[in-house]
Every structure is written in C-alpha cells, then in structure tokens.
C-alpha cells in the first residue's frame, strides 16, 4: 500500500460556493469538517482555510467560530456594496494568491469549489509539479475544472459524509447565489455536530506569513 503520509496538503474552501451548491441542489447544509478529513485522507495537513465574507451585522460570527472549533482557519473579507446596489464578496483572486504564496510548502493543493475560474490556477499548480485536487458537488462544477484536476472528489457520490440534512430545507435550483447571505441557518447544525478532530497542522515556523484578514473571536 502506498504511503501518503509524507504528502503535505493545503485545503482551501470556497465557503459560499459550497453553501449554495448544497442548498440549491440538495436542500441541505455542508459538513465542512468532513470535507477536510475526507479530502486529506492519510496525508499530512499543513493548512485548512475557509474563505468567506463578513457583513455589518456580524450575524455570521457564530458560524466562523464553529469552523474554528473544527480546526479550520477562517479568512474573511468585507462585503463590498456599490451605489448601484450591487454586492460583491467573491474570493477567487484571494484564494489564488494564497495558494501561489504557499505552494513551496505543499505537495497537494485541494480546492473545494466548482468555480471554473480556478482552471488557470490548476494549470499553474500542475506546472509547478504539485497535485491539483478538486472537491465539489459535480452538478454545480465546471467541466473544465474537473478535466484540469489530477484528482477529483465528487461529494455527490457520498452525500451522507458531506451533507447535514435538514427536513425544513428544500432544494432551490433556480436560486441565484448572493454574497449578502450570512449562513445563520447553518450555525446551529455545525455547532451541534460532534467535534471533528483534524490532524495537527505544521508548526507556524514552517509557514509563510498570512496575508489579508483573519477573524478574531
């Protein structure tokens, strides 16, 4: 059996992409702790980072705290609101920059998203001799992103591991994602789940300085 314990892995989670995929397709919530555990396997965790937005109300803070308790770092950016009423809070550029900066300390990059904007990143990661692992719900994933991946994990093949069912939820396939939503409906479920123990990440001395903002709870 192949020993994978030496492989250094970074898991980068596009929270909103996962949240809306699970809600719109399955009417369910995401088990973020299991996403990290299942994509990591027997490999060595260096960093597990969730990227999301913060709002003026602060209602999402309990959700961030739940992720912290699972051993997942949380990076946030403020929701941008324009005079036109348009709101923007996507993280694709920020995630890409972080991965490029951390690449020297990783053997495997796990991008948890179905967004086709990560295809150029995947090509770069592979050209640098690293493994590009994509994990997502196939129904909401770009075919080009799947083709680009060295390894692809389809959460839809093992829904009990990656979803938290809620009888009050119903699939809403025609609902458009909005950066203003703040995840209050997933907070209680994440907090009530059994504590997920993630492998200890590498010591801070082995890691580059973190860019951007991290939530302080």
Where are these regions (language model features)?
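Terminal and domain-boundary accessory regions
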Residues: 1-217
